[in-house]
Amino acid sequence: MVMQPGAAPDGPERTFIETARRAQIARAAIDTIAEVGYAGASFARIAERLGISRGLISYHFAGKDDLIKQGVQEAAEQAIGYIRPRILAESSGPAMLRAYIEANLAFMRDHRSNVIAMIEIARSAEGRRIFDDDTAVLNAVGALENLLSGSQTAHQLRPGFDPHVMAIAIRAAIEAASPLLALDPEFDIDHYASEIATVFDLATRIGDGPTGPEAD
């Protein structure tokens, strides 16, 4: 059979093996970008990393953009799978907010290559946007806003703040850690997470005293 670029079927027709192979290639692409940069992450380089032929990558992906989109999706799903259970394990608004912040930053700590790759994917060396993730940003803000507003409705967080503005501020504080983690070997992301979680606990709480370990 002659394999054509992007010839692997989409949707329900894609087999379990094909889906697993696409995920494997996408993860390897993210790791390769983290190691050699966006420009250096060629199909040949990714194939070498996996010990497969370049043609096999071309069979599963129509081009580099297609592969990178899949890589970003894989990274996002990995993050959701890590973060969501830690939030849902908590039962109060303040505890869920702290878990949200600390889990996001813990995931970044444990998946540093993802952080580096996302920085590379977001911008070229000239600052030109390579991959447009505006929808993902809006979705992240919206989900956090829902958590905050729901906790306000349940009388678990202070009613006087704007949940949309607060969600933007929290996401900005989390994302600010990305370049520091990527570039500064001395950056203590665990300390940063604890401090940021306390800052937003103080900004959103109803009663006196923080909800974190400082209260013990």
Predicted features along the sequence, with ranges:
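Helix-turn-helix
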Residues: 24, 32-66, 70
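Amphipathic alpha-helical packing segments from all-alpha helical-bundle domains
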Residues: 77-85, 110, 116-117, 128-154, ...
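Conserved hydrophobic residue
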Residues: 39, 157-158
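Short, structured helix-loop boundary elements
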Residues: 22-23, 43, 65, 69, ...
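Hydrophobic alpha-helical connector segments
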Residues: 70, 81-114, 163, 167-170, ...
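C-terminal peripheral helix-coil segments that are non-catalytic and often amphipathic
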Residues: 1-9, 106-110, 141-154, 169-216
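Amphipathic alpha-helical segments used for helix-helix packing
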Residues: 96, 108-128, 179, 183
